[in-house]
């Protein structure tokens, strides 16, 4: 009783498991075959993609025509006899050629397959088959057009190449060459005058560069001479056009701040810092041309005398006072005898102290 039960259980469990394992093994073998076939197709696809003469060209628009037109063209070419050939193919029966055309039509048609093939892969395979057919047709045509075997000794390489179809353009044929402007011209006819013309062109270019550099240097020197680099705090534009001698002196030395005071007919700037009231007491003969260094010393003496008399008068120490003409002192443009900030500050501090 127990034996029959164990046998029944074993059969009930073992038979379905065994059948399932067998089915799984069959599916696995089929899947492996499919994988191998797909790997082979992928390798062919990669070879077709990386073939530069098959895809990167301008002559492969013919294979994109319809398969019916392709078959009609092939049949018309086979039906027309070749009068130039000396072989027996030109006198063949039309039925044999129709059979050949049918054999050629079969690879171009769609093949029924029980496996699913993607559209892009079918298109690539069709293009590859058409390219192969084109190569075979061209090879057959070149063989037919060759002279007979008796005259094969007179056949040259050029005559055989004349019947070969037009080669496909590769990637390197599509590259645009770029030629530099300088250097010899490759498209010109070689002559003895080219060297002399190149030498003349080089000499003219060197002379032109030298002239432009010299003119730029002259402009730089002229602009530097027109600048007044000696003025410490310029209140107006450069006055080198008023007196050329003073501008040259200011260009070569720092003492232009001294000579700028002696400029003739110098206009007073209204927007400059107001000068002290003691400057208005200077003699009018200071600006005359006939006075030299003696006049300067006399003006200094008179200035010192006036300042001694008016000690209580605030005097602005800046470059525009004749008393401190030998020194350069920084100034406050907003401080004068009317707005004495330092004195006001001092008075304010004194007012804060306790009385």
Swiss-Prot record:
The entry's keywords: Cell membrane, Cell wall biogenesis/degradation, Membrane, Phosphoprotein, Signal-anchor, Transmembrane, Transmembrane helix
Designated name of the protein: Suppressor of lethality of KEX2 GAS1 double null mutant protein 1
Subcellular location, record wording: Cell membrane; Bud membrane
Assigned GO CC terms: cellular bud; cellular bud membrane; cellular bud tip; incipient cellular bud site
Biological process terms in GO annotation: fungal-type cell wall organization
Gene designation: SKG1
Lineage top rank: taxon: Eukaryota
Keyword field contains GTP-binding: no
UniProt family annotation: Belongs to the SKG1 family.
Ranges facing Extracellular side: 1-8
Modification Phosphothreonine occurs at: 273
Compositionally biased tracts (Basic and acidic residues): 92-108, 286-304
Sites of Phosphoserine modification: 142
Main location, first listed in the record: membrane
Lineage: Eukaryota, Fungi, Dikarya, Ascomycota, Saccharomycotina
């Amino acid at each position: 009783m127990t034996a029959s039960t164990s046998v029944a259980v074993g059969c009930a469990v073992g038979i379905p498991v065994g059948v399932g394992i067998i089915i799984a093994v069959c599916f696995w073998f089929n899947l492996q075959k499919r994988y191998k076939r797909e790997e082979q197709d992928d390798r062919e696809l990669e070879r077709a993609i990386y073939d530069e003469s098959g895809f990167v060209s301008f002559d492969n628009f013919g294979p994109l025509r319809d398969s019916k037109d392709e078959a009609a063209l092939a049949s018309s070419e086979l039906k027309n006899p070749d009068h130039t050939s000396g072989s027996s193919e030109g006198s063949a029966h039309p039925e044999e050629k129709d059979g050949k055309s049918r054999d050629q039509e079969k690879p171009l048609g769609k093949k029924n397959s029980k496996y699913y093939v993607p559209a892009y892969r079918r298109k690539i395979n069709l293009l590859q088959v058409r390219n192969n057919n084109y190569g075979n047709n061209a090879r057959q045509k070149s063989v037919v057009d060759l002279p007979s075997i008796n005259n094969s000794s007179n056949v040259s390489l050029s005559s055989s190449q004349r019947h070969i179809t037009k080669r496909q353009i590769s990637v390197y044929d599509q590259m645009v060459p770029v030629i530099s402007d300088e250097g010899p011209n490759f498209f010109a006819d070689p002559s003895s005058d080219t060297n002399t013309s190149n030498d003349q062109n080089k000499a003219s270019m060197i002379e032109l560069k030298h002239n432009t550099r010299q003119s730029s240097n002259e402009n730089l020197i002229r602009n530097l001479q027109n600048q007044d680099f000696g003025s410490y705090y310029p209140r107006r534009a450069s006055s080198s056009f008023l007196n050329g001698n003073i501008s040259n002196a200011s260009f070569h030395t720092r003492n232009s701040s001294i000579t700028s005071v002696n400029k003739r007919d110098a206009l007073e700037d209204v927007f400059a810092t107001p000068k002290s009231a003691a400057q208005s007491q200077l003699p009018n003969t200071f600006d005359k041309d006939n006075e030299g260094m003696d006049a300067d010393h006399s003006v200094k003496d008179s200035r010192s005398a006036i300042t001694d008399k008016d000690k209580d008068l605030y005097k602005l120490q800046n470059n525009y006072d004749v008393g401190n003409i030998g020194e350069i002192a920084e100034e406050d443009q907003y401080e004068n005898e009317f707005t004495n900030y330092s004195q006001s500050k001092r008075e304010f501090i004194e007012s804060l102290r306790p009385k």
